[in-house]
């Protein structure tokens, strides 16, 4: 049993099972498992107070349904627990802070839909909050803060719908916000999210809603709240599902092209275009050759390249020693994700074989304010590129000492990404839509500081691990010539799991890699070797934090290996490989994948 000090009332903790309902309409069989998410808030102090903000729901809900009749589907709503407890020291008025929450915690509402094979099933639903009938109602019978001052707040993050709490908002009763008065059977109620949707082409589709509760210790007399209890529940209602023919839904790459004007409208850019960064109005899709055909890539301030695919299978922490763990090891660990969190991506480009290349973009859904630039929750944590930096080979995603293009040993960052992919996500599950693809780690080199050409960078007659200055291929293309390429110069640097159309080194354990500096420049940034730093904070790959690219820069003075990266200030640069930078994995969806949605922040692509 949890014990509290004299200033704290005990936490009321309880759990209620959901209710099961069956509905039959024409040929549709709809199985709906409806969960309830409980909130309990106990007040116990004069000035700032101790709050227990508790959300509970049975999450052991399971169902198997054979979808044989047209339109058969299962719709499941379940959740975990949010438990916000404020330490006694945070209650004192001398600790008041109107900007930083004294405590916060997050609960989850998980929605799962499985439709019938061959049919496009669409379910809409609302997410509502209802006070218990015997509870106090915050903001109706007791005073609340006014204006922008935050006290007891709710923030709701999810994939789509009209979300009234997408930004943190005081959770006070206010009929202008849509609150309804209590009745004899129901407490006061407000709709948090209206018209959220989930679609399925026969595969299981799900979305996680995050409900964040926060308590602010105010420099105000809050005696009127002392001893009050605010309890309620959050649940799904107004579930409406329909089915239609799903056989005409386009493949994913076709959908992307159609949503961006079609392949025929896309042009090829030149070094003149790449010599400058994009502006906020400079955006779209363009084309360029890659190793497998014609690639179509996003550039500039695009906001329609969002994808939700995959989930975390366990909690994940990034610790100060550059490792990841399922628990907080105490080594200055930062939590990256919770088990069950959705994974969001940004599409970089359609590859030449029509697979879809994407870069990791966190576990929170985009909002209107983050639809182009998302500056939080975009990295898998920090890692060195390689723990060692004193040999030329250490610029490699894999390397063999004594060889220019070796693949005998994994780099530090490859080990990090492989561990994440295989052990912390469901991306490696049977039936995954992730497919093999070429990830270029261009180690062609020159001993001269010259622009890139095959002659200049592919004709070394000897190789030295130390003592010789090397400039790598990406340096010659980007720094000297503003001529990025999506082709990879030699097969030994085309990192793949298996051969793809007779190309690739087959050295990878898992189909995951890093973005190249060429892709970053084509997306809208620019690297210049002049003293003038080009800054772009308006294109979709800007995150406000440093992260690695997978392109070698140079072996400086014959003693230190350097790799390209992106700086949080908005410019492309480089660091020695032993430095700790952000990690953003890159994967590719199969060319057979189908995407539902439009890719915008409130209609994110989902993968079928």
Segments and roles (model prediction):
Residues 105-123, 128-134, 188-244:
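C-terminal, structured domain-capping segment
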Residues 15-98, 224-245, 598-601:
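Short, polar/proline-rich extracytoplasmic segments that appear immediately after membrane translocation
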Residues 23-26, 88-103, 162-217:
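Extracellular adhesion/glycan-binding regions together with long Ser/Thr-
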Residues 139-146, 223-225, 334-339, 575-577:
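Short consensus segments that form the blades of beta-propeller domains
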Residues 42, 51-54, 97-178:
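Surface-exposed interaction patch
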Residues 80-135, 312, 317-319, 338-341, ...:
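N-terminal segments of secreted, surface-exposed, or virion structural proteins that
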Residues 72-76, 203, 244-608:
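Long, domain-scale functional regions
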Residues 2-3, 7-21:
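Short, Lys/Arg-enriched N-terminal segments with co-localized hydrophobic residues
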């Amino acid at each position: 049993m949890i014990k509290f000090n004299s200033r704290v009332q005990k936490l009321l903790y309880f759990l209620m099972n959901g209710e099961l309902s069956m509905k039959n309409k024409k040929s549709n069989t709809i199985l709906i498992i409806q969960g309830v998410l409980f909130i309990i808030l106990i007040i116990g102090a004069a000035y700032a107070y101790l709050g227990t903000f508790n959300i509970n729901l049975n999450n052991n809900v399971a169902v198997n349904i054979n979808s044989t009749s047209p339109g058969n589907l299962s719709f499941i709503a379940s959740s975990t627990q949010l438990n916000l407890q404020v330490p006694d020291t945070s209650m004192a008025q001398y600790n008041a802070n109107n900007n930083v929450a004294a405590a916060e915690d997050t609960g989850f509402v998980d929605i799962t839909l499985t439709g019938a094979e061959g049919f496009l099933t669409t379910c809409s639903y609302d997410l509502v909050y209802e006070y218990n009938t015997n509870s106090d109602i915050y903001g109706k019978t007791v005073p609340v803060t006014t204006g922008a001052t935050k006290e007891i707040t709710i923030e709701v993050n999810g994939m789509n719908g009209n979300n009234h709490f997408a930004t943190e908002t005081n959770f006070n009763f206010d009929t202008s916000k849509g609150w309804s008065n209590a009745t004899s059977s129901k407490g006061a109620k407000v709709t948090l999210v209206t018209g959220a949707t989930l679609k399925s082409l026969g595969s299981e589709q799900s979305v996680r809603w995050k409900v964040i509760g926060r308590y602010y210790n105010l420099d105000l007399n809050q005696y009127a709240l002392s001893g009050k209890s605010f309890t309620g529940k959050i649940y799904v209602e107004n579930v409406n599902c329909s089915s239609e023919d799903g056989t005409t839904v386009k493949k994913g790459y076709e959908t992307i092209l159609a949503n961006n004007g079609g392949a025929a409208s896309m042009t090829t850019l030149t070094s003149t275009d790449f010599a400058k960064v994009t502006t906020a109005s400079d955006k779209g899709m363009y084309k360029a050759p890659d190793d497998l055909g014609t690639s179509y890539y996003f550039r500039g301030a695009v906001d329609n390249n969002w994808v939700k695919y995959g989930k975390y299978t366990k909690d994940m922490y990034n610790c100060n020693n550059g490792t990841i763990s399922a628990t907080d090891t105490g080594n200055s660990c930062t939590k990256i994700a919770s088990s069950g969190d959705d994974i969001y991506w940004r599409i970089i480009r359609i590859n030449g074989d029509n697979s879809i290349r994407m870069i990791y973009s966190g576990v929170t859904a985009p909002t209107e304010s983050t639809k182009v630039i998302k500056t939080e929750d975009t990295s898998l944590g920090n890692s060195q590129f390689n723990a060692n930096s004193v040999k030329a080979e250490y610029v490699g995603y894999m390397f063999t000492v004594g060889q220019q293009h070796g693949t005998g040993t994994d780099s530090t960052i490859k080990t990090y990404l492989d561990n994440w992919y295989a052990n912390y996500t469901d991306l490696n599950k049977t039936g995954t839509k992730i497919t093999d693809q070429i990830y270029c780690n261009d180690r062609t080199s020159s001993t001269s500081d010259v622009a890139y050409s095959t002659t200049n960078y592919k004709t070394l007659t000897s190789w030295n691990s130390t003592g010789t200055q090397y400039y790598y291929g990406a340096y010659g293309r980007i720094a000297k010539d503003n001529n990025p390429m999506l082709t990879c110069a030699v097969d030994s640097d085309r990192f793949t799991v298996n051969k793809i159309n007779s190309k690739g080194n087959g050295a990878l354990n898992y189909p995951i890699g890093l973005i190249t500096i060429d892709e970053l420049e084509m997306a809208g940034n620019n690297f210049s070797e002049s003293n003038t730093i080009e800054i772009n904070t308006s294109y979709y790959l800007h995150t406000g934090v440093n992260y690695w690219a997978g392109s070698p820069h140079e072996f400086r003075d014959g003693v230190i290996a350097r790799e390209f990266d992106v700086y949080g200030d908005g410019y492309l640069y480089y660091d020695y490989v032993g430095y700790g930078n952000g990690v953003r994995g890159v994967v590719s969806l199969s060319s057979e994948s189908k995407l539902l949605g439009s890719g915008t922040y409130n209609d994110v692509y989902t993968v079928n």
